[in-house]
Amino acid sequence: MKKIIWASIVVVTSLCVNVSAQIIQGYVRNKWAQPIPNASLQFTSLSSGKTFTARTDANGFYQLNLPFFEKESENRSFLVFDVFPNPFSRETNFIVYALRSVRATVSIINRNGQIVRILYNAPLSEGYNYITWDGLDEKGAEMPEGMYIMQITSGKTTVAKKVLRLTNAPSSGTVAGNLDPEVLLETVVATYQVTVEAPGYKKYQNPKFIPQGKSTHHWVLFKEDTLPFRTVDHYLAIRKADNTYEPIFINGICLGISTPGTNPGNLAATKEEYRRWLTLIWEAGFNSIRTYTLHYPRFYEVLDEFNREHFERPLWLMQGVWLDEELSSPNLYESSALFDSAIAEVLDCMHGNRVIGERQGRAFGTYNLDVSDWIMGYIIGREVYPDEIIYTDSLMLHQNPNLTFYNGKFFSIDSASPSEVWWARRLDFFMDYQKSRYNKSVPLSQSSWPTLDPLTHPSEPPYPISSEDWTQVDLSKLKVVAPNGGYFASYHAYPYYPDFINDDSLYRTFSDSYGPNSYLGYLTTLKNYYGKKPLLLGEYGVPSSWGNAHYAHSGMHHGGHTEKQQGIYNIRLIKNIHQTRCAGGYLFALMDEWFKTMWYTNPIGSTYARRSLWWNVVSAEENFGFISFQTDTPNFKIWPELSVNCWIDKAKFSYDPAFFYIQLKLKRDINSNDSIWVAIDTYDRFLGESTAKNGFKLDSRSEFLLNINTTRPLLYITESYDTYGIYHGYSEPTQKYRSTITDGEPWNVVRYTNGWKEYIDIDSVGVLNFYLYSNPLDTPTSKDAVFFKNKEILVRIPWTYLNVVDPSNQEVLDDDRGTKERETRITDGFQVQIFDNWKLCSRSTEKRMLWPRWDKAWPYNERLKESYFILKNSYPNLDLKPF
């Protein structure tokens, strides 16, 4: 669904339906899903102070009549929120909150009062209903610009909202920060404080409960337990009803939530989005979620709500405490006070005991709901860089040569480096704060990665050629002094990085049922080093990007995978994690995140401020999720149609936040002897190459040349504009990184480098994937650039392949290699010429095609990738139980 700005609310009064009060019922259970009889429940209205009570029967069941509205006169059947975006060009949304299931009809009416489209004619579901209009009429024809009415009718009640359709309406972004539809819902419905109590259990208090029109609500009570989870030989374990501990293999997922148009500090998700995402995670078969930092209170409220409703199989939380990267000094000791303060803040928030004032870039609010019982452990910190460790160790040893041990209240360490001592102190502070303030302890770790592992890697070049095996942090020496949840090692370990995972001869001897697997060798060796200490993969996974930033011995590369391959490889990885007796792993990640950057695409990428406004399908780091974000179908009417008038009939063009599109209509089927050439001039008609690869003279000098055929479609770039080797600094002198005037100079297939000077690897992205509809053995993939279907060809080219630095800003690469800066230029639009290998066709667009810039993310839909369904269908068949 789309992110919605809830600008206003219309209250609809039903004349015939009494929904002022509803029956609320459910069960009160403990964490082992056992019923709790004779538990008392109290619902106190936050506005009137009126209290409603109930008690559970022998089966833990309760029931009571609870008003949904404060006053009997306020009987309502549904609530209508405003239309968004408005004005719109592609899609707009009508949002209805139904207090009960009632039949409704949603219509689009033009300015003449004619109904041009019935969008919806069915019962509304209880809760939120999202109804989208794509600007088309009942027959699928595009409606002209102008004012329209979106109208909902249910029984005798009708509500209408005006909406303006413009062909080039300004892009509408997403709502950020702490605005949530439930904030508006609270203004019109009753809100309660809920207290649930039973002898022998902790009192449960929910300070702000909204029934939401649902009739069933379950509650979970926990025993007073100082050690609900602990580490037990290789695994984290949960206390059972008989006070023994049962090991858990963690099959978790990392909860990144940076939707298009947002950055991590926004934490912009609404309650409704959290509910949907947790449901997807749960239905896929995951048992835990990991957060890196503190979220807004609404996330923890939804987590508690979700786990109460799924008490037989809850989603356990692995909560993080972030260590700032923007530190004043690389000396870790100078960040101690700030980091300890962050630890205390997170612990207080998890126990419902902190109010944080408004601040920029971080979550804030009133944390008054105790969710600590849903937390199985904490991972604090981040991937610390080798230079930070080297700097800290050298400086602190110089100041204090005896800084090699620490004897704390809960942890101690000997024969340690100052950095290891620093981590031991932070872990000890964490455990002491939690134990002294809240009389509780759960397993604890700090984030690490292979770059700092305690192993020696003979294949890795020494510093300064490489810093990947330069230093280490070894907390296997950490000892438990006083009873607590224990320590477990946590690594972000992927199958393609660093190089030693692929190159060490020992690791390369390993294989699994899929084939050679040096990653399995690395995990086996690392786990053997830690012995019985639990080793958890805090991150693992492969992305479904078009570009491949790093090759892997196992074939599980840093990108270059289809969504299907992504799913298969992620199943392979969790199998590897399980068979090496690791404690489990957290798949990275829930969703694609457009804000992310990486070295592979950085030299021709947009600035941080604008990166989240468009989708770079080439970048591996943007495409790790199993949720993708798609805008509506490209509009091929925004630019004039090009009549080629030969066996190639017509050409149309379009764009979206990810691709530039070319649609060709043919008068006959393309055959194996045909080649269609498309010359693309991306900026400045006076720059570029004048001659195509086949010797054909171009109408307009161009930077790119696309060869469409049914055996090997290729995308070429002029030698001058070629960026091959740009990141590593070993491009040829003839590569200017800008378009120049050339006549008969070479055309190169678009390629990227994903290795170092000494280890050059080539990613030939210009060799385009294609789908041939007439081939019964062919199936479309998420990486296909060319689609052949009957007498139609659709081409989609990622912006990055065309050296478009930032499509949202109309910005293309136009560099001066003589400066340190990377120069760009605002394009004057694309000009395209189409011709064939028979030289029977040749036609160019008359005008340059320039798309409007946008400053906010386009409205989008969430789409589950093919990889999600592979995971969901595979997990039940995997025996992911602790050994």
Identify the function of each model-found stretch.
Residues 47-67, 172-179:
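Short, acidic Ser/Thr/Gly-rich low-complexity loop/linker segments typical of extracellular
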Residues 68-84, 88-110, 130:
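Glycine-centered coil/turn sites that cap beta-strands in beta-rich domains
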Residues 121-156, 170-173:
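Short, surface-exposed loop/turn motifs with a glycine/proline- and acidic-biased composition
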Residues 222-280:
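N-terminal carbohydrate-binding accessory modules
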Residues 466-553:
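Glycoside hydrolase catalytic-domain groove-lining segments
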Residues 552-555, 576-652, 864, 868-874:
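Aromatic-rich peripheral "rim/lid" segments of glycoside hydrolase catalytic domains that contact
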Residues 644-753, 813-839:
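Surface-exposed, glycine/proline- and aromatic-rich loop segments on solvent-exposed faces
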Residues 681-703, 790, 803-883:
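Acidic/polar low-complexity flexible segments
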